Amino acid sequence: MFRKISFVMLCVMILAGCAASPTPTAQTKNLIGKLAYETAPQFTEGELQQLVASQNEFASAIFAHQAEAKENLVISPYSLYQALSMLYAGAAGETASEMQQAMRLPWEDARVHRLVNALNQRLLNSAGTGDEGSQAFDLQIPNALWADKNGTYEQAFLDILSQNYDTGMKLLDFKDASAAADAINAWVEEQTNQKIQQLADPAMFSADTALALTNAVYFKAAWRYPFNEAATADAPFTILNGEQQSVPTMRLSEMLNASITEELTMVQLPYAGGTMVMEILMPSLDMWNDPAALAEFWASPQGLPELQPENVSLSMPKFRIETLTMDMIPALNANGMRLAFTDDADFSGISGDESLYVSTIAQKAFIDVNEQGTEATAATIAVVTQKMAPGGEPLQITIDRPFIFQIRDTATGAILFIGSVMQP
């Protein structure tokens, strides 16, 4: 059997000019949906697996597009997908249909919101329990919406967000762009352990801004089998042009799920306290240098081999990646989501106003992998504006050339982060 590669943590801001909703109380200065957060959403395991499959297919496609530059990369398809799900709650007509296609949603109805909630809760609950006394990992998936204090919004939109994403709207005066950016940035920095800073730029806000939507994913976990820090030493790493560089390389001897084929070396590193793993995938240099073969590898549902328990002697570089702001619109365009970024967009479900379109979707991300474990986080901004107008010898696995990594929950299959290391 094979699994498909899929898509590291995200924060999305959606700004919009809007029209028709409840009035906040002076006490809370919040807009709250009428429906309480659903802590026990109804779902079948089949539905949940359909959602995970759609997210993972989306993740593969987005990563394949972003990885074309062949640079160090980390993104969070999980957070991007969740942010798009919240935006989808306000989409209508052909705009909604294109988003459904791009997100690989198998349903036309609104069940995606209930299932996103269910998957979030499944993952968060698994983070709270360690196995055999081990320390549970830290996983946070918070949401926050920020509304212009004079704006009005559709009650149905607010209800979907309160019931499935556990958020209302905090009121801001977007005319004071600097204060609005400061408030949102403070929230983002707190949720990402200060790793994602200055996400919101005052230039994003104006008198026409009505809504900012933020989602963050933060993950931190120790390895189940830590690397021996004393064994870390410089070792050669061959980059794609054939040049060798000396990089700090960690070493571990342990029973691990692994596979070696002519085209791909793969090893799975479990985290302590649950079902989360990091999977390291090292394609052959021939595959890296053959765009057609690499594209087929990303696109194929048979992209990943079945892993087997092996006595592994592993060498791999430690690495830390902090991306610059990445424009995600080209990747979404390439996956069929086009109308949302044009004057023909229809986000009337947000406010009843049809003159809204998405002008920006960008993401920043961070990951640090060392002998003790992993810390990863990401943030994305989407701006919606008004139209202006075992056994035997150890299996030797040496990660000494460009590789791909992904952080995945083995219980659900959900991929939280994916990236590539071209030059540690």
Regions found by a protein language model. Give the residues of each.
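Detector for small/aliphatic-rich hydrophobic stretches
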Residues: 2-174
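Non-catalytic interaction/Regulatory regions outside core domains
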Residues: 8, 18, 27-36, 352-355, ...
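Short glycine-rich loop/turn motifs
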Residues: 59, 263-266, 364, 400-404
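Non-catalytic, conformational "gating/processing" segments within enzyme and secreted inhibitor domains
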Residues: 70, 109-284, 307-390, 394
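Feature captures eukaryotic membrane-trafficking machinery centered on endolysosomal pathways
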Residues: 74-96, 268, 393-424
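Short beta-strands and strand-coil junctions in structured, solvent-facing domains, enriched
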Residues: 195, 287-288, 414-415
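Internal alpha/beta scaffold segment
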Residues: 283-308
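Short, solvent-exposed amphipathic alpha-helical segments in soluble enzyme
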Residues: 296, 383-385, 422
